[in-house]
């Protein structure tokens, strides 16, 4: 009796449209795209369909500005990717796949101070409210992603600015809040969850 060869996960892919509700011109991505205007010919992205994998979208070219996690599914307009974020962004201009998301084996350690100093707490599950689980501060000074990929949020309930934190970026070591993302002006993180791949 022979068995089928083991198959890895399907390659990451998503389709972008320049109008809401999957209308207008479209472009399909299978890898990083630093500027959708140059590579895909779209001036803006107003709706997204993620076929495989998880992606990080950025509001500006060259992976700059606010980050938005895009997991498998449909995003017919900006409110679908912004969620309950206090930040309105109706444009996405650069994209990259999240390559290290493994929901079953994700681990991150939060530190109160910069450079992995002070009180610490290790997580391997989703936390809609870090203060409710005993994290005394509204800020996280630094963190280490041991495995997987995480999305941290500015406020409880997975609201506010999003920061995608991966083992494969910065070797999983984020020494201070400015390394969380280009839009990080504070270390305020109050909820965190594993990226769904």
Swiss-Prot record:
One Pfam family linked to the record: Crystall
Region entry Connecting peptide, spans: 100-105
Top-rank taxon: Eukaryota
Keyword Disulfide bond: no
Domain Beta/gamma crystallin 'Greek key' positions: 12-52, 53-99, 106-147, 148-196
InterPro entries per record: Beta/Gamma-Crystallin (IPR050252), Beta/gamma_crystallin (IPR001064), G_crystallin-like (IPR011024)
SUPFAM superfamilies attached to this UniProt entry: gamma-Crystallin-like
GO BP term, example: visual perception
Keyword vocabulary terms for this entry: Eye lens protein, Repeat
GO molecular function, one term: structural constituent of eye lens
Annotated function: Crystallins are the dominant structural components of the vertebrate eye lens.
Binding partners and assembly: Homo/heterodimer, or complexes of higher-order. The structure of beta-crystallin oligomers seems to be stabilized through interactions between the N-terminal arms.
Family according to the record: Belongs to the beta/gamma-crystallin family.
Name by which UniProt lists this protein: Beta-crystallin A2
Upper classification of the organism: Eukaryota, Metazoa, Chordata, Craniata, Vertebrata
